[in-house]
């Protein structure tokens, strides 16, 4: 059986309490990598322990074995559990044993007609839904599926308490955003992404990886198969073991690729619409985003795929398509609501704090930084091509003072990554003339604060 962390046990307790109060549907929100499957397995175990039947719905066949193994490891009575794809359940309504509880993982998909067909048929059965992002491109909420919502600990807390890995975020732009066009679904079309990326020098992708994440186990997210394969070829030509995988890859070949990646035989795994949900490789420490998107769900799932916690691990996120300008960072505070959000003509609301890229090392940093916390070099503003989110609300910040004789000050020259103690971050802040908040922010980002 699993030993739940306190924050996971709290989710279990809150969910059971809501169900005991006759809630028809409870939506549980917890960040990617926070161990939602373990929470689900514990709720299923406690339900079957009382003789209740559980129906667990998945939207992809590949996830069935994974959740089944998780349930079995947690001593869930599988005789009382139905684990199937939503399509198969919808086609077997009336033939399957009636459940006492319906559990849906990745429930941001649950507005689809197939899910609604199941929920309507079992209208008197309470349901639990799990997601990291209760958000849809069309702005629709989930109040017609769930009547209450429980939020777990945020990403920033999970990093600070060593349940998620701290990260570095770099953005070396390889896309012309002015050429991106949306489809009826609300996300960018593949054709417009082709135009926006243009004649990408794939060697630049490899060069950036070598500079920022050399040797790290890396997942690449591409927008189409041809592009993904060309990126893989560029890595191979550089002598780096790499492979491409997508939904059309044969099952046996796909299993071998996944196995080789998990074992370390492959350093680079590039994919198209395959590795976002339910794929767990804790020692993957880097992701490369080559697919621009308007989907917050997709951004979070892809950006945080490398942030599974391991001792001394520092994740690296390389964003070649400036998705951060649309969504902020993985640990940007977000306001979730069952009612959804009001869609705007020029994209969705971005509550992210203003951020920009350092022109020297391409680290994404708060807009008020005048000295990069990653490379220690002075940052000038837009005149030097800084990528700044001008749609974000600018919060009032104090003036930063640049330390005179910068090159002579050993603490001013140090990077935040080079120190291990919180007090050393405060020394760097003092040497550079920063306010104490800079040290606190970096201490949280680096996982030094509990």
Give, region by region, the residue ranges found by the protein language model.
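Conserved segment of the helicase C-terminal RecA-like domain
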Residues: 306-331
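Walker A/P-loop
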Residues: 22-43
């Amino acid at each position: 059986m699993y030993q739940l962390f306190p924050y996971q046990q709290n989710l279990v307790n809150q969910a059971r309490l809501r169900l005991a109060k006759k809630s028809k549907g409870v939506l549980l929100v917890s960040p990617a990598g926070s161990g939602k499957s373990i929470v689900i397995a514990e709720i299923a175990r406690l339900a079957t322990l009382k003789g209740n039947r559980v129906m667990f719905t998945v939207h992809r066949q590949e996830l069935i074995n994974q959740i089944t193994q998780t349930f079995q490891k947690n001593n869930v009575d599988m005789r009382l559990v139905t684990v199937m794809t939503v399509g198969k359940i919808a086609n077997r309504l009336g033939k399957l044993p009636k459940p006492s509880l319906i559990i849906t993982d990745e429930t941001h998909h649950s507005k689809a007609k197939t899910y609604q067909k199941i929920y309507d048929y079992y209208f008197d059965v309470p349901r639990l839904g799990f997601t990291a992002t209760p958000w849809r491109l069309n702005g629709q909420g989930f109040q017609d599926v769930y009547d209450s919502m429980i939020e777990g600990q945020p990403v920033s807390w999970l990093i600070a308490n060593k349940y998620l890995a701290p990260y570095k975020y770099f953005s070396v732009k390889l896309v012309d955003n002015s050429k991106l066009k949306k489809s009826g679904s609300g996300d960018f079309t593949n054709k417009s992404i082709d135009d926006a990326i243009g004649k990408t020098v794939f060697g630049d992708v490899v060069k950036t990886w070598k500079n920022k994440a050399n040797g790290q186990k890396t997942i690449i997210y591409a927008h189409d198969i041809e592009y993904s394969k060309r990126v893989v070829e560029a890595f191979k030509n550089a002598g780096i073991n790499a492979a491409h995988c997508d939904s059309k890859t044969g099952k046996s070949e796909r299993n071998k690729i996944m196995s080789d990646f998990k074992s370390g035989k492959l350093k680079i795994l590039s994919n198209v619409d395959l590795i976002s949900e339910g794929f767990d490789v804790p020692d993957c420490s880097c992701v490369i985003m080559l697919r621009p998107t308007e989907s917050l769900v997709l951004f979070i799932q892809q950006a945080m795929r490398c942030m599974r916690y391991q001792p001394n691990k520092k994740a690296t996120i390389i964003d070649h398509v400036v998705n951060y300008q649309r969504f902020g960072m993985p640990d940007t505070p977000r306001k979730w609501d069952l009612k959804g959000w009001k869609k705007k003509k020029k994209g969705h609301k971005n509550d992210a704090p203003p951020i920009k890229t350092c022109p020297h090392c391409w680290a994404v940093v708060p807009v008020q930084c005048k000295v990069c916390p990653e490379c220690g070099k002075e940052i000038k503003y837009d005149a030097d091509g800084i990528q700044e989110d001008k749609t974000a609300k600018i919060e009032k910040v104090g003036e930063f003072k640049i330390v005179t004789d910068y090159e002579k000050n050993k603490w001013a020259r140090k990077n935040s990554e080079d120190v291990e103690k919180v007090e050393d971050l405060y020394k760097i802040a003092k040497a550079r003339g920063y306010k104490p908040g800079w040290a606190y922010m970096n201490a949280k980002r680096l996982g030094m604060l509990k």
